């Protein structure tokens, strides 16, 4: 039989595509995970009501360590849907799951949905000018990750924008805000002193992408770090060299200071 990786989109249950909904309704079993992203505009109950089926929510451990024992045996005999926030294979974990399904002899298909990679277009930044992405992770104990700082540096040297995903600890209901991410980046700057991320760095904040009322703000770190961007999820973007249209958009739509029209272009 078949395993379907079905994207749920970005914000609420209405973001799933018609194709995804039709296939999910026909499946014998429906699983989902919500630890890779937050769909702030919906609930499990609303998704179940839309699909008309009970959904078993899998934990990170279920997905990463027990997928072969929980999902794949059922997919060998039945049609199974695995629902994921955003677009299914944007999360590298899900790509690995499809490899496992292939090796287990389970046929699989991917049903796409809105993704943060397309939604960032609402910031006015040109998609083709984004470089490598990175995740700003919460420090834990003696572990203080800094690789995202290096990604910003590498992209900036090429004039490219950096999309920063912000850490999620779904089991603890912890969703990093853009403010927390900026604070962490300033700490890393103090450690590395590379001039990559300072109070005068231009940043763009996008909150609740996919909703009807997203927050889109652009400005210098010193001006935005204390601003309230509303409920998560948030992402943080560090722009590279701006095209004049990008700069004008950030000024007119995202509230960036007009001086970026001559400084950053």
Curated annotation (Swiss-Prot):
Coiled-coil parts of chain: none
Residues the entry annotates as binding S-adenosyl-L-methionine: 10, 87, 90, 115-116, 166, 209, 234
Keyword Transferase set for record: yes
Pathway membership, UniProt: Protein modification; peptidyl-diphthamide biosynthesis
InterPro entries: 4pyrrol_Mease, 4pyrrol_Methylase_sf, 4pyrrole_Mease_sub1, 4pyrrole_Mease_sub2, Dphthn_synthase
UniProt keyword terms in alphabetical order: Methyltransferase, S-adenosyl-L-methionine, Transferase
GO molecular function terms noted in the UniProt entry: diphthine synthase activity
Superkingdom of origin organism: Archaea
EC number: 2.1.1.98
Catalytic activity field: 2-[(3S)-amino-3-carboxypropyl]-L-histidyl-[translation elongation factor 2] + 3 S-adenosyl-L-methionine = diphthine-[translation elongation factor 2] + 3 S-adenosyl-L-homocysteine + 3 H(+)
Biological processes annotated in GO: methylation; protein histidyl modification to diphthamide
Entry-linked CDD domains: DHP5_DphB
Further information: The diphthine intermediate is not stable in vitro and readily eliminates the trimethylamino group. It is not known whether the elimination reaction also occurs physiologically.
Function comment: S-adenosyl-L-methionine-dependent methyltransferase that catalyzes the trimethylation of the amino group of the modified target histidine residue in translation elongation factor 2 (EF-2), to form an intermediate called diphthine. The three successive methylation reactions represent the second step of diphthamide biosynthesis.
Record note on quaternary structure: Homodimer.
Family statement: Belongs to the diphthine synthase family.
PANTHER family assigned: DIPHTHINE METHYL ESTER SYNTHASE, DIPHTHINE SYNTHASE
Family annotation (HAMAP family): Diphthine_synth (MF_01084)
Protein name in the entry: Diphthine synthase
Species, as recorded: Pyrococcus horikoshii (strain ATCC 700860 / DSM 12428 / JCM 9974 / NBRC 100139 / OT-3)
Gene name, Swiss-Prot/TrEMBL: dphB
């Amino acid at each position: 039989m078949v395993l379907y990786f079905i994207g749920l989109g970005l914000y609420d249950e209405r973001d799933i595509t018609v194709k995804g909904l039709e296939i999910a309704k026909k499946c014998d079993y429906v699983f989902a995970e919500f630890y890779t992203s937050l769909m702030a505009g919906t609930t499990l109950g609303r998704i179940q009501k839309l699909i008309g089926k009970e959904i078993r929510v899998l934990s990170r451990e279920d997905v990463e360590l027990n997928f072969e024992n929980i999902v794949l045996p059922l997919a060998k005999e039945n049609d199974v849907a695995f629902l994921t926030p955003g677009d299914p294979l944007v999360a590298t974990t899900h790509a690995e799951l499809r490899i496992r399904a292939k090796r287990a002899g389970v046929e699989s298909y991917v049903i796409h949905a809105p993704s943060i990679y397309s939604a960032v277009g609402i910031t006015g930044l040109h998609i083709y000018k984004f470089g490598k992405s990175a995740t700003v992770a919460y420090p834990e104990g003696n572990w203080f990750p800094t690789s995202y700082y290096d990604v910003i540096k590498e992209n900036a040297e090429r004039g490219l924008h950096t999309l920063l995903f912000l850490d999620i600890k779904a089991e603890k209901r912890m969703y990093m805000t853009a403010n927390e991410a900026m604070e962490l980046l300033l700490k890393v700057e103090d450690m590395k002193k590379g001039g990559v991320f300072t109070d005068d760095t231009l940043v763009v904040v996008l909150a609740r992408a996919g909703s009807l009322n997203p927050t889109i703000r652009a400005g210098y770190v010193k001006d935005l770090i204390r601003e309230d961007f509303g409920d998560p999820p948030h992402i943080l973007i560090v722009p590279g060299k701006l095209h004049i249209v990008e700069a004008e958009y950030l000024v007119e739509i995202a509230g960036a200071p007009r001086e970026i029209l001559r400084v950053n272009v």
